[in-house]
Amino acid sequence: MYRLTLAILLVTLVSACATSPTGRKQLMLVSEQSAISQSKQAYVQTMGKLSSEGKLVTDPKILKRVDTITGRLIVQAIIMRPTTSQWEWSVQVIDDPKEVNAWCMAGGRMALYTGLLQKIDPTDDELAQVMGHEISHALANHTAERMSNAMLSQGLALGVGIAADSAAVMAGAQGAAMLALTLPNSRTSETEADRIGIELAAKAGYDPRAAATLWQKMAKAGGGGPPQFLSTHPAPGNRQATLAALEAQMMPYYEQPGPRPMYQLARAPAQPAVKKNAPALQ
């Protein structure tokens, strides 16, 4: 039974491969749709709780700025991956002055914290780098990849320990996948999100040179150490060198003339923003 369990796992690994937008091979034991469904549940529960506590920002000036930047990025994300036009793109600003963070779940549900806006004080170009980076995690299916890696680790461990009980293997692996929703991305994923994010931002009309200044600000925000946002990110020296090389490649996208289209986000009171049918020019 032990050999059979390992054989099943090996066959699954061979067949469960995907390719990210950068061409990197990914392990995918969890479907993107499953990751989106579970992320949606977590997002709705989280936002409902925050709304009841009065922690969702309603300041129209802040929301307009965030919606404009993310709206322009979303258009470019859809161009890069047309299937994401079916996602329920959402964005919320969470009132937490201590949290220097932002994120985007599978399916395009986003949030950023007032701590990032207050402590980093990003320009629009810098904020576009943050949100472009986070959107890139969703584009590259990093949530499902993270869940898949957790399933593999747990499945192999259980397969060795209790190979005679395949139900236990699956239950444990699925539990590990759910836990992975709350875990950080790997450094490989972070580097990939840097690469995709700076391109999204440049194509959306935001200066790619802001990437370097943003991460310098982020590195300083933690005082004696980096903020949580950077806990699994590449080392600052390596990151700055990589971004500097990318800046020159991205400048032609940024310098293209003409208006940049913006995806319209319609916001109901105390609810995650939901999409309208068509993009509109800013």
Where in the sequence are the language-model features?
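Metal-dependent nucleotide-binding catalytic modules
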Residues: 8
